[in-house]
UniProtKB/Swiss-Prot annotation:
NCBIfam families: panD
Pathway field: Cofactor biosynthesis; (R)-pantothenate biosynthesis; beta-alanine from L-aspartate: step 1/1
EC numbers: 4.1.1.11
Cellular component aspect of the GO annotation: cytosol
Protein name per Swiss-Prot or TrEMBL: Aspartate 1-decarboxylase
């Protein structure tokens, strides 16, 4: 059996560009792509923290070191500059890979769209 698992996540990145008339996609700083394990043309889900919008598109490379998160084409209508988003990719993972210790790549952003941390799991949510 295979399970549809979270593979990659870029958490709380700020939208830096919205290019309505660019061919669809989301341009992501190449450093962030590498850190998260997302590759060019991979399907991604984007969740806008500010307005609750959730949509899918595909990743393209943005300028390395720029902090770029550019929503292009119709996706540009789903966010404003500065909105915080979560970018996620999923994978089909078989039971043997899971039992062998398969883990997702999670990247956490600071206020300047620079990486402030990495994790390989989502912590247990507690009531506090």
């Amino acid at each position: 059996m295979q399970r549809h698992m979270l593979k990659s996540k870029i958490h709380r990145a700020a939208v830096t560009h919205c290019e309505l008339h660019y061919e669809g996609s989301c341009a992501i700083d190449e450093d962030l792509l590498e850190a998260s394990g997302i590759i060019e043309n991979e399907r991604i889900d984007i969740w806008n923290i500010n307005n609750g919008e959730r949509f899918s598109t595909y990743a393209i490379k943005g300028e390395r070191g720029s902090g770029m998160i550019s929503l292009n084409g119709s996706a540009a209508r789903r966010a404003q500059l500065g909105d915080l988003v979560i970018i996620a990719a999923f994978a089909m993972v078989d039971e043997a890979e899971l039992q062998a210790g398969w883990k997702p790549k999670l990247v956490f952003m600071d206020d300047g769209n620079k990486i402030k941390g990495h994790r390989d799991h989502v912590p247990t949510q507690n009531w506090t």
